[in-house]
Curated annotation (Swiss-Prot):
Together with its co-chaperonin GroES, plays an essential role in assisting protein folding. The GroEL-GroES system forms a nano-cage that allows encapsulation of the non-native substrate proteins and provides a physical environment optimized to promote and accelerate protein folding. One of its GO terms (cellular component) is cytoplasm. The keyword Cytoplasm applies. GO terms for molecular function: ATP binding; ATP-dependent protein folding chaperone; isomerase activity; unfolded protein binding. It holds the Pfam family Cpn60_TCP1. Keywords: ATP-binding, Chaperone, Cytoplasm, Isomerase, Nucleotide-binding. Its EC number is 5.6.1.7. This is Chaperonin GroEL 1. Belongs to the chaperonin (HSP60) family. It is found in: Cytoplasm.
Length: 562
C-alpha cells in the first residue's frame, strides 16, 4: 500500500479552497447571456468550444491531489444538478463557491463549523420554500419558448423549435436531439412510443460512442414469458435471417443459452438483433405488451392464449420504421400496425380512464395513453462546422431539459433574481446563537449568481445588486439587452426546479467541505533517476495461431450455438 499524506484543519481547508476556486473560476465565466466561452483541448479531433458549465467542470483535473479533491467535490455539485434538473450547473457552482468561500472566512475567525452547517441547512430550506412559493405554472407555448431561449443562451430559434416540439407531441411526448447533415436546425415529428426498459446486454449496442442500439425497419417479436431455451426461438430466427431483416425481441426476460446465442450471432454479423425486457409488471405488463403489439401489428404470444413460441412465423411479427434502445429506455418510432386497431385501442383506454375510481390506475392508464397516442419529435441541429455543431447541440439539450423542468414545477423570474429575492425570507429566521451566522452567510451567497451574470456582461455586480434590491419583486437586470426591466414580462425566466436543485446541491457540498478536518491522499511518487544505459530490446513474441471458428450445431443453419 502506497504511503499517504495527511493534512489537518486549516491546511486541509485551504487546499480544498484552492481547488474549488480553480474549478469555479473556469466554470462561472460561462454564466448568463453574456457569458464567455471555454475552449477544451481533446486528445483527438478539434477542441471543444462550450458555454455549458457541467462540460467544463467534467474536464477539470488538477495536478495537486489535495486541491483536486476540492475541485472534484464542486464537480459533483455540477453533475448532480445536471442529473436532477438538466440545467443550472453553472449557477450551482457559483453558489457552492460563494457559500464555501464565505464560510471558510467565518471558520478561520473562530466560528463553530457544525453550527454554521446547521444554520446553512435551515436557511437553504427557507430559500427553497420561497422559490417554490414564487413559482407560477407555465401558461402557454410562448412561456415554454422563453424558458428554452434563456437556457439556450438567448437563441430564439432554438426556443421556438422546442416550444413547437412540445406542442406537437404533448408534455408527455418524447423529444430527441440529433445532428443534421444540413446547416439548418429543423424539427421532425414522427409517431412513436417510449418505455423505460433498455437492452438486456451491452453487446447489442450498434453505436459505441452513444451506447445505443438502433434497429432500422426491424421485425418485432412480442412474447409474455421468459425465453431461455434457444430451441424455442431458433425456427423463427432462421426465417428472419432468410429475409435479411433486423429483429427486436420483447419479453419478460431473455436469459441463459438464448441470450448467449443471440449475442454471439450479433457479434458475428449473422443477424442484427436486440432483446429488451417487457415494460411494467403483472397484468399491467400484459396490457402494455398488447399496446405494443397493436402499435406494431404483431401477434402477442400470451400464455393464457396457449400460443407456443416454437410455432411462431414471420407473419406473427410486428414491424416499425426504427427502434432506438439505450441502457434505460426504448423508443419505437412509427409502428406499422393497423391504424383502425390503434384508434380502437386508444378509445378503449380513454373509456377505462373515465370509468376507473382509483387515482393510481388512472395515472397508469394515462401513461399508457400518452405512450400510444403521443409522438416522437426529433430536433435536427445543423451548423457550419463540427465544433459549432457540438456546441449548439449541447445548448439544445440544455434548453430541452429546462423546458421539461419548467413544465414540471413551474417558472420563476430569471437573471438570478429569484434567489436574490428569496433572501428576504431569511429575515424572520432567528436562532439567537451561532446558527444565525450561517443564515447570514446564505443571505449573502444567494446574491452571487446575479452579481456574476452582471460581471460577465461587463457591469459592476455590486451596483446592479443595489439597483435590483430597490425594485419590485420581478424587477431585475437583463444582461442580454443591458437594461433594467420587469424580467417576467420580458421573458427572462428560469424553471423553479433548476433553481431549487442548484441551491440545494451547492449548500449540501459546501457545508460538507466546511466541516472537513482532515484530507488523506497518496504521497506523490519521487521521480527515479534515469538508468545509465537502456536495456536491450526484448525479442518480438511469436504470433498466436488463429482460433478456429465455432462450429454450428447440426441442423441449426447459420446459427452458432455458443
Amino acid at each position: 500500500m502506497a504511503a499517504k499524506q495527511i493534512v489537518f484543519s486549516r491546511g486541509a481547508r485551504a487546499a480544498i479552497l484552492k481547488g474549488v476556486n480553480t474549478l469555479a473560476d473556469a466554470v462561472k465565466v460561462t454564466l448568463g447571456p453574456k457569458g464567455r466561452n471555454v475552449v477544451i483541448e481533446k486528445s483527438w479531433g478539434s477542441p471543444v468550444v462550450t458555454k455549458d458549465g457541467v462540460t467544463v467542470a467534467k474536464e477539470v483535473e488538477l495536478a495537486g491531489k489535495l486541491e483536486n479533491m476540492g475541485a472534484q467535490m464542486v464537480r459533483e455539485v455540477a453533475s448532480k444538478t445536471s442529473d436532477k434538473a438538466g440545467d443550472g450547473t453553472t449557477t450551482a457552482t457559483v453558489l457552492a463557491q460563494a457559500i464555501f468561500g464565505e464560510g471558510l472566512k467565518l471558520v478561520e475567525a473562530g466560528h463553530n463549523p457544525m453550527d454554521l452547517k446547521r444554520g446553512i441547512d435551515a436557511a437553504v430550506a427557507k430559500v427553497i420554500e420561497a422559490v417554490q412559493k414564487a413559482a407560477k405554472p407555465t401558461k402557454d407555448k410562448d412561456q415554454i419558448a422563453q424558458v428554452a431561449t434563456v437556457s439556450a443562451n438567448g437563441d430564439k430559434e432554438i426556443g421556438q423549435i422546442l416550444a413547437d416540439a412540445m406542442e406537437k407531441v404533448g408534455k408527455e411526448g418524447v423529444i430527441t436531439v440529433e445532428e443534421n447533415k444540413r446547416m439548418t436546425t429543423e424539427l421532425e415529428t414522427v409517431d412513436g412510443m417510449q418505455f423505460d426498459r433498455g437492452y438486456l446486454s451491452p453487446y447489442f449496442v450498434t453505436d459505441p460512442e452513444k451506447m445505443t442500439a438502433v434497429l432500422t425497419n426491424p421485425l418485432i417479436l412480442v412474447h409474455e414469458k421468459k425465453i431461455s431455451a434457444m430451441a424455442d426461438l431458433l425456427p423463427l430466427l432462421e426465417q428472419v435471417v432468410k429475409q435479411g431483416r433486423e429483429l427486436l425481441i420483447l419479453s419478460e426476460d431473455v436469459e441463459g443459452e438464448a441470450l448467449a446465442t443471440l449475442v454471439v450471432n450479433k457479434l458475428r454479423g449473422t443477424i442484427k438483433v436486440a432483446a429488451v425486457k417487457a415494460p411494467g409488471f403483472g397484468d399491467r405488463r400484459k396490457d402494455m405488451l398488447k399496446d405494443i403489439a397493436i402499435l406494431t401489428g404483431a401477434t402477442p404470444f400470451m400464455e393464457d392464449l396457449g400460443q407456443k413460441l416454437e410455432s411462431a412465423t414471420v407473419r406473427d411479427l410486428g414491424t416499425a420504421k426504427r427502434v432506438e434502445i439505450d441502457k434505460d429506455n426504448t423508443v419505437i418510432v412509427d409502428g406499422q400496425g393497423d391504424k383502425t386497431a390503434i384508434k380502437g385501442r386508444i378509445e378503449a383506454i380513454r373509456k377505462q380512464i373515465a370509468d376507473t375510481t382509483s387515482d393510481y390506475d388512472r395515472e397508469k392508464l394515462q401513461e399508457r395513453l400518452a405512450k400510444l397516442a403521443g409522438g416522437v419529435a426529433v430536433v435536427k441541429v445543423g451548423a457550419a462546422t463540427e465544433t459549432e455543431m457540438k456546441e449548439k447541440k449541447a445548448r439544445v439539450e440544455d434548453a430541452l431539459h429546462a423546458t421539461r423542468a419548467a413544465v414540471e414545477e413551474g417558472i420563476v423570474v430569471g437573471g438570478g433574481v429569484a434567489l436574490f429575492r428569496a433572501a428576504a425570507s431569511l429575515e424572520s429566521l432567528k436562532f439567537n446563537d451561532e446558527r444565525d451566522v450561517g443564515v447570514r452567510l446564505v443571505r449573502r451567497a444567494v446574491e452571487a449568481p446575479l452579481r456574476q451574470i452582471a460581471q460577465n456582461a461587463g457591469v459592476d455586480g455590486t451596483v446592479v445588486a443595489e439597483k435590483v434590491r430597490s425594485g419590485a419583486p420581478t424587477f431585475g437586470y437583463n444582461a442580454a439587452t443591458d437594461s433594467y426591466e420587469d424580467l417576467l414580462a420580458g421573458g427572462v425566466i428560469d424553471p423553479a426546479k433548476v433553481v431549487r436543485h442548484a441551491i440545494s446541491n451547492a449548500a449540501s457540498v459546501a457545508a460538507l467541505m466546511l466541516t472537513t478536518e482532515a484530507l488523506v491522499a497518496e504521497k506523490p511518487k519521487k521521480e527515479k533517476a534515469a538508468a545509465g544505459g537502456a536495456p536491450g530490446g526484448m525479442g518480438g513474441m511469436g504470433g498466436m495461431g488463429g482460433m478456429g471458428g465455432m462450429g454450428g450445431m447440426g441442423g441449426m443453419g447459420d446459427f452458432d450455438m455458443g
